[in-house]
Regions:
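Cell wall/extracellular polymer interaction/catalysis modules
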Residues: 1-144, 152-172, 181-234
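A conserved hydrophobic position in a structured secondary element of the catalytic/binding core
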Residues: 149
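Hydrophobic transmembrane alpha-helices
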Residues: 176-178
Length: 234
């Protein structure tokens, strides 16, 4: 009889993941206690804001509909400027609606979580031949388009992500925004950063998703239309 090995058990066979749990699971559980959240059966949602260089971790408890902010991690460093990633080597951190598609327990940057760039929107709007890729949230403090949060903090985030996936969450969503896209912000950013209409329209498109989550603390399913724009699924 073949014994089933859970995702968490498989991950814990890696020394760095085992170390992360030993060092950081108690810290992560304390975040839950401080926010009066249940550690069992939760789901995770990530939001990154490039201008302020912050990565938010939101939690949805089992049986609940709404997400609650658990913790915020600071980027350790950044690259590029505000605006989406459009080609290999542009140093840009992507902007858009993504999910974690890879857990790397033996990363060159300690531990890392892969972001599914290029996604369906990027496949339409980015360079067709060389859109770039290999975008990760990772340890260390160096980047050419990724989000580094230090070895110390990636341990915490990796534990959270492993727990969520082990709880049955197939895709951990991550929304990456240039800034907090409140009313008037896309227009002000477009002026301050002297971007072209393609970039400003991208920001206005993302604003609808940002504002909906801000108002409801729920994630609506999103699809991509033929123009590469995000839209709520009907």
């Amino acid at each position: 009889m073949v014994q089933h090995v859970s995702f968490k058990e498989a991950q814990l066979k890696n020394a760095r993941v085992k170390s992360a749990y030993q060092e950081k699971e108690a810290v992560v559980k304390e975040y839950f206690r401080e926010n009066k959240l249940d550690y069992g059966g939760f789901q995770v949602f990530l939001r990154a804001f490039k201008k302020e260089q912050n990565l938010e971790v939101w939690i949805k408890e089992k049986g609940k509909e709404e997400f609650t902010l658990l913790h915020t991690y600071a980027f350790c460093s950044t690259s590029g400027t505000l605006g989406p990633k459009r080609k290999e080597g542009d140093l840009q951190i992507p902007e858009g609606i993504y999910h974690i598609n890879h857990f790397n327990p033996v990363s060159n940057f300690y531990l890392s979580l892969g972001v599914n760039y290029p996604n369906a929107s990027d496949n339409i709007l980015s360079d067709k031949q060389h859109p770039g890729g290999s975008i990760y949230i990772h340890g260390n403090c160096v980047t050419i388009g990724c989000i580094p949060i230090t070895d110390d903090k990636i341990k915490e985030l990796y534990v959270l992500a492993v727990e969520a996936k082990n709880n049955g969450q197939e895709n951990i969503p991550i929304h990456i925004f240039p800034d907090r896209l409140d009313m008037g912000v896309p227009e002000k950013l477009a002026q301050d950063y002297a971007v072209d209409e393609k970039v400003s329209s991208c920001w206005k498109n993302l604003q609808a998703i940002y504002l909906d989550f801000k108002a409801n603390k729920k994630l609506k399913p999103v699809s991509v239309n033929a123009k590469g724009e995000y839209q709520f699924k009907q």
